[in-house]
Structures are given as C-alpha cells and as structure tokens.
C-alpha cells in the first residue's frame, strides 16, 4: 500500500491561477500552510496596513480575507489555502 500525498493549494482572488505543493505528510502540509498564511499576512499588513479576517471554511480549507480601498476602488482580496489527501 502506498502512502498518501498531501497537496497544499493556494488561490488568491487578485491573481490568476493557483499554486500547488505536494507534501509527504498531513502535518507537513499544514505547517507549510501556516507559514504561507503568516507570509501573506505580513506582506499585506506591511504594504496596505490591513489585518485579515481568518475564515475556517471547512476542515481542510482556510481563507484569509483582506478588505481594502486600493486605488480608490473597493477591493476584497481572498486568499484560500486548501489541503487535500491524494491516495
């Protein structure tokens, strides 16, 4: 029996496409997700002086939501992180 792979997917509403990263364990995938969330949060807080709302969408999906007025237009950026098990 082969061990499952865990895929971390990051999608942002202000970017086209997504990124996917494989991990050998669920713990490694969630550790990487937490690092990505911290990095994205720091980048937005530094650039736009905004703090995100964190929304737990389901057991495997977490979303950061940044509401802002950028370039004189209302803009909501949603960054979603998902971890899936692939057997």
Model-derived regions: residue spans:
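Short stretches within intrinsically disordered, low-complexity N-terminal or propeptide regions
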Residues: 14, 22, 31, 44-45, ...
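Short, mixed-charge low-complexity intrinsically disordered segments
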Residues: 38-87
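Short aromatic-glycine-(Arg/Gly/Cys) micro-motifs in beta-strand/loop hairpins
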Residues: 1-19
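Intrinsically disordered, low-complexity segments enriched in proline/serine/threonine
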Residues: 6, 24-26, 54
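Intrinsic-disorder/low-complexity coil detector
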Residues: 3, 21-23, 51
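Short, flexible N-terminal segments of the mature chain
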Residues: 19-41
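Residue-level signal for short segments within beta-strands and strand-turn junctions
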Residues: 10-12, 24, 49, 85
